[in-house]
A protein has these predicted regions:
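Transmembrane helix-loop-helix hairpins at membrane boundaries of multipass inner-membrane proteins
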Residues: 2-3, 18-101, 105-115, 191-196, ...
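Structural signature of hydrophobic alpha-helical transmembrane segments
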Residues: 2-9, 83-91, 134-143, 210-219, ...
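C-terminal ends of transmembrane helices
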Residues: 16-23, 97-107, 149-157, 226-237, ...
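Alpha-helical multi-pass transmembrane bundles of energy-transducing inner-membrane proteins
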Residues: 24-26, 115-119, 123-208, 290
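Cytoplasmic-side transmembrane-helix entry/capping segments in multi-pass membrane proteins
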Residues: 28-35, 110-118, 163-170, 241-242, ...
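Juxtamembrane/interfacial segments at transmembrane-helix boundaries in multi-pass membrane proteins
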Residues: 50-76, 174-231, 235, 257-281
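Membrane-interface helix caps and helix-loop-helix hairpins in membrane proteins
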Residues: 106, 128-136, 267-271
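Single conserved hydrophobic/aromatic residue that forms the stacking wall/gate
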Residues: 288-299
């Protein structure tokens, strides 16, 4: 088994352990053991990665593994990491570990809460190790689905409103993202959804890039709280439980930025360069709204 698959296997084992656990002590034991294992694995991966780079390994992605899932659509379980994804895995593991203790006394439905929390964590880790477009999208959605319940059930204040608003906006972003990913795949003429191979082909027509890039960037940008699609974020943060807010701000929103870089800008660099003026306008809007806001959580 590839070492990177540990980051999906551990949450799966945690889900099984939580499902079978009886009593609060057993539930906490499963969470602490699993979160500790993820943290240790991320630290080990960081040292292994640095060791490979120090030894002169210049491969774009390290610790690669590919397993074909569905041949007709060329969907594979393809994993690999570079410096950015290694850093994000380490950050995610730290937040999952600390978030576990932040939820130590959470009531009610402690078992169900940790089941959804673990499922969200699995989606995050799976997304950061994936290099296949379909697999990335699958883990991306796995990470988003639990947010509705984690906020709507265990949140506070206007939790139902915040959860519904978050869900509707992220669903809209996911629809744009799915269209963009399919457009990239069919437009590239590739026989695989592996983003490294699509990037090497580099044959997505510029006219198509100008269509698929905005859709993909917008799809990820909604989760990354890209202006003006950020209005769900303040409500979500204010209503979410502490640990969920930690994971939300520290990791989940980073999925959006990582996806913009890893898929949109990496696979369609010409469109990214041509449409860079949009980023300048959005930056100006962000500075203006930040100056006008009277509550920091609304920035």
């Amino acid at each position: 088994m590839n070492f990177l698959s540990i980051f999906v296997l551990i949450p799966l084992l945690m889900l099984a352990g939580l499902w079978a656990a009886r009593g609060i002590k057993a539930i906490r034991g499963v969470m602490v053991t699993g979160a500790s294992a993820l943290l240790i694995a991320s630290v080990v991966l960081t040292f292994l990665y640095l060791g490979e780079r120090s030894a002169g390994n210049t491969a774009e992605m390290l610790f690669r593994a590919d397993t074909l899932w569905y041949a007709p659509l060329h969907i594979s379980y393809s994993v690999g990491v570079d410096g950015i994804s290694v850093a994000m895995l380490l950050l995610s593991a730290v937040i999952v570990f600390t978030g576990t203790f932040a939820s130590w006394r959470l009531q009610p439905l402690t078992k169900e809460y940790f089941l959804w929390f673990t499922l969200l964590s699995m989606g995050v880790f799976g997304f950061f190790i994936s290099v296949d477009l379909f697999t990335m999208f699958m883990f991306y959605e796995i990470a988003l689905i639990p947010m509705y319940l984690l906020i709507g059930v265990w949140g506070s204040g206007r939790k139902e409103y915040a959860a519904m608003k978050l869900t509707l906006m992220l669903m809209g972003g996911s629809a744009f993202l799915l269209i963009g990913i399919l457009g990239i795949y069919f437009g590239s003429g590739a026989t695989t959804m592996n983003l490294l191979e699509i990037a090497q082909l580099h044959n997505i027509p510029f006219a198509q890039q100008c269509i698929w890039f905005p859709l993909t960037f917008l799809g990820f940008g909604v989760l990354g709280a890209l202006f003006p699609f950020h209005t769900w974020s303040p409500d979500g943060h204010a209503s979410a439980p502490t640990a969920v807010s930690m994971l939300h701000a520290g990791v989940l929103m980073k999925l959006g930025g990582y996806g913009c870089f890893r898929i949109a800008m990496y696979l369609m660099p010409e469109a990214a360069n041509e449409l860079s003026w949009i980023f300048l306008i959005l930056t100006g809007c962000l500075l203006y709204t930040s100056d006008a806001a009277d509550d920091l959580i609304g920035v």
